Amino acid sequence: MMLATTSSTFATLGEMVTVLSIDGGGIKGIIPATILEFLEGQLQEVDNNTDARLADYFDVIGGTGTGGLLTAMITTPNENNRPFAAAKDIIPFYFDHGPKIFEPSGFHLVEPKYDGKYLMQVLQEKLGETRVHQALTEVAISSFDIKTNKPVIFTKSNLAKTPELDAKMYDICYSTAAAPTYFPPHYFATNTSNGDQYDFNLVDGDVAAVDPSLLSISVATRLAQEDPAFASIKSLNYKQMLLLSLGTGTNSEFAKNYTAEEAAKWGILQWMSPLWEMRSAASSYMNDYYLSTVFQALDSQNNYLRVQENALTGTATTFDDASVANMILLVQVGENLLKKSVSEDNHETYEVALKRFAKLLSDRKKLRANKASF
């Protein structure tokens, strides 16, 4: 992807919808957190404003699993109605709390690996009583209801029709992170417009969407149709979107690990871990393939950037290795990723691409502000 700001692009930036999507992946959320810290730093530099935050620049921020937690951290307001966490605060959060969230407690074959109590405790401490409607920009955080067998998407823009989705952010964050076999499912209740109790029985958003890019685009489309701020956009299409999608890495050793001959001998237990990884990798690859194809077909390939490390090895591939050594390794993975080429066909580095993306976000924000002042 090469983000070039042409005169025609600049003229339409004010009418574009900006979307940030963050994948799930447990402790591997440190990788996109590293990218977010770099991007927010670039936005602060471009606009000469140390208080600039990602929520100031994106119309929709979507996340699933650990990506949902990152979404909440950068959109939940503090007492000054600014994001309670800057991007640079996210990695310290993982280092401070990751080892306790993923604290080993023996062998668990018939129950979740972790009890989730510390995770819920820290979410309540950090997010307080904040609800979805208070988010500083539109959010799209996914989960899956095991009772209704349907995905649940928590957003601001649809609360008038579905007020029961105006849940507390800590309930949402625990739910989107409650990966089956790792954490217990989460039950909580809200109220409908009639005052009736509405029950949720939720597990990890990765069950519905490991890569929430398409979900985030759907929310952005509805936002453009219903929000008066986007009245000038008659019919939103991919040419009017800037989409930044952040992955949590895929296992480069996975393809070497299994063969059809070996898998033919597997039973339920042997399939559990590989099947989860296969499903996650396939979902991520297919979303990226689809989006790349569509944006390119519409001559809008400059509007989409997928930042993903496809060469994870060793402990860096694990969902829950929160040892200090592995977390340091994941930070290094994120920092090294910035120096890598966007693709085999595009030798521009992610660092350069993100700098250009930051400039586009800044220009678009200024154009919209100028338009609003008239």
UniProtKB/Swiss-Prot annotation:
Gene that this polypeptide is encoded by: pat3-k1
Catalytic residues (UniProt): D204 (proton acceptor)
Other notes: Patatin have a dual role as a somatic storage protein and as an enzyme involved in host resistance.
PANTHER family: PATATIN GROUP D-2, XYLOSE ISOMERASE
Record-annotated PNPLA domain positions: 20-217
GO molecular function, one term: phospholipase activity
Keyword annotations: Glycoprotein, Lipid metabolism, Plant defense, Signal, Storage protein, Vacuole
GO (cellular component) term, any one: vacuole
Signal peptide: 1-11
Glycosylation positions in this chain: N48, N191, N257
Protein name: Probable inactive patatin-3-Kuras 1
Pfam family, one: Patatin
Post-translational modification: N-glycosylated.
Domain notes for this protein: The nitrogen atoms of the two glycine residues in the GGXR motif define the oxyanion hole, and stabilize the oxyanion that forms during the nucleophilic attack by the catalytic serine during substrate cleavage.
InterPro entries per record: Acyl_Trfase/lysoPLipase, PNPLA_dom
Family classification: Belongs to the patatin family.
Organism in which the protein naturally occurs: Solanum tuberosum (Potato)
Coiled coil: none
Motif segment (GXGXXG): 24-29
GO biological processes: defense response; lipid metabolic process
